[in-house]
Amino acid sequence: MIGLNPEMRLISPMLDRAVIDALFPADLPEAAHWERRYPSRQLPGSAQVTRFGPSPTGFVHIGGIYVAMIDRDIATHSRGVYLVRVEDTDTSREVAGALTQFARAFDYFGIRTDESDEHGRYGPYRQSARESIYLTYVRELLRQDKAYLCFATKDELADITARQQAAKIPTGYYGSWAIWRDADPAAVQTKLAEGAPYVVRFRAPDDAAGQRVRFTDVIRGELEHEANRNDTVILKSSDQSPRLPTYHFAHAVDDHLMRVTLVIRGEEWISSVPLHRQLFDALGFKPVTYAHIAPLMKQIPGGKRKLSKRADPEASVDFYIEAGYPSAAILYYLRGLANGRLAELPLSEALSTPIRLDQCGVAGPLVDLVKLDDISADYIATMSGPQILDAVRTWAAQFDPDLATVLDTEPDLALRALAVERDGVDNPRKDLHKWSDFRAAYGFFFPQLFTPLSGSTDERLLPLGVDATITASFAQDFADGYQHLDDPQEWFNQIRELAAKHGFAASVKEYKKNPDAYPGSIREASQLIRIALTGSTRSPDLHAITQTLGSAEVLRRLRTLSTGTA
C-alpha cells in the first residue's frame, strides 16, 4: 500500500511556504487582489443577492426553472441582484449544446440575469473561467495548514472503503484513515519530485467528530446536522487542466466574491451545509443564508416520488416549450406550487405578487399536468385572436413548419376561425391548452390541413351507425339544395327539414321509442354534416363554421360525403 500506514501516521509540521507557492503560477494574485476586485455591493439593507447555478451536464429540469424563478423573484422584490453562474467544473460530464438549451429556456420564461460577462463586474460567470481565483484561495488554505496535498490512489481509496465497510464504521477519508493528512513534508516532497498526481483536501477540524451543527434555513427554520469530519477534496487532480475545484469549494469562493447573500437550492444539499460552513469559516468568509427548496414530485400508484429526468418527459423544460405551453401559464402554475396563496389570485396579480420563502412548503409539491392544462386553457381564453395567432405562428415556425406556412398564407381565415365562439361571448372556447393543440382544434378550417371524407363509407362515419346509402343520399340532397344563410335557425332548418324527408326521427326521444323505424335521429343527421365539414363529431357551432369556411368550401366538403370526390 503506497503512502502512510494509518497505524503509523506522523504528526508533522506543515509544508514550507516556498514548496506550497511553487505548486502555483508565479504570477497568481493574492487573496487581497480578488477582494479589491470584487468589492461589497452597494445595495439597500434588505436587498438580497441570489444566484442560479445551472450545470451543463444535461437538459434543464423544470425544477431548475422553479428555483430560478424564485431566485429572480426574491432579488426583484428586495431590490437586489439576480445572477446566473454556470457551474461547469465537471468537464467530463458536460453535454454539447446544454448551454444553448439553458439560454433558450431562460429566455422562454423571461427569467433574465442582472449580470453577465458583458455587463457585470463580478464575473467571469462560468466557473471554468475562474481557475486563477480558486487557485489563490486553495494556496491560502495550504499556507495556513487548513488544506493538504493527498497522493492517495484510487486503489488505496477503494481499500480504505473496503476496510471501513468490513469494520462496519462510516466510510470516508477522515481521522486515521486520512493517510496524507499529517504526512511528513519530506514524504510529500518526494512524491512531488516523482511527479505523482495529487488532489488538495480540506483539513476538517480536529474536533469535528461527534459534533452537531445548528443553522437556520429560511424555509425550514432551525436545523441540526452532524458536523462534517471528512477531509473533502477541494481541488481536483494535478494531472488535469484546467485545475478546477469541486462544487463545495467553488460555492464558498464564488458566493463570497460575488457577494451572494441568499443561496436557494434543492433540499439534497442540506446535508452539505456543515461542510460549507467549515469552508466559509476556514476561508474567513461571512457565511451565506440558505433556503432549501423541496423538489417537484410526481404522483404514482401508492405514493409519490421526485420528478425524474430519466423516467418523466415532463421533467424536461423542452417538454413544455415543444408542446407550446404559454410561459405565463407555466410560471403562474409554478408560483402556485411555491406559495399556495398565489394559486388563488388572478394570473396577472399572481405573477406580480412577491413569493415568500416562509410560505414554501417542506414537502415536495406535485406536478399535475391536468391542472396545468386547465390553467393554460383559462389563460389562452383571455387572449385576443391576433395574440393567439401570433403565439401559434411563433411556436409553429420552430416545431410545425407546415402549419406555420399555412398560417402565413391564410392569416384572415385563421382569425375568423379563432373568432368562432370566442369573440363577443361571456364564456369563450377553451379548446387550446397549448399551441400544439391548434392543428387538432382548428386545422379543419384550412383546406390544406383538412382530409375530406372518402365517401359515405368513410371510417369517421362508422360511430353514427347510419346506413351508407342513406348517408350518401342525404348528403347529396343537402348539397343540391344548400343555402348559405346568415340566420343560424334558418340555416339549421335546412338540416331539420331534409332529415325528416329522409326518415330521421325529429328528436332523440322519438328515435329511442322505436329505433328500428328510423335510420337515426336529428342528432345523427346533424352529425353527418358535422363530420363532413370538420372530420369529427365534436366541433364548435356548425352554422358558425359554415360562415367561416364560406359557401364554396362547404359545398366541396358536402360533395365528398356523397361521392367521395369534391
Q: Whereabouts are the PLM-identified features?
A:
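Glycine- and acidic
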Residues: T50-T57, L83-D88, L257-V263, E314-S316, ...
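Short amphipathic alpha-helical segments and their helix-coil junctions
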Residues: A47-R51, L83, P313, E349-L357, ...
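N-terminal Rossmann-like or analogous alpha/beta NTP/dinucleotide-binding catalytic cores
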Residues: L4-A167, P242-L244, S271-F285, A329
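Residue patterns forming the tRNA-binding/recognition surfaces of aminoacyl-tRNA synthetases
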Residues: L135-E140, Q144-K146, Y198-V199, P205, ...
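Catalytic adenosine-cofactor/nucleotide-binding cores of aminoacyl-tRNA synthetases and other
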Residues: L283-L462, T534-A566
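Active-site cores that bind ATP or allylic diphosphates and position pyrophosphate for catalysis
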Residues: Y148-H292, M297-L307, S316, K434, ...
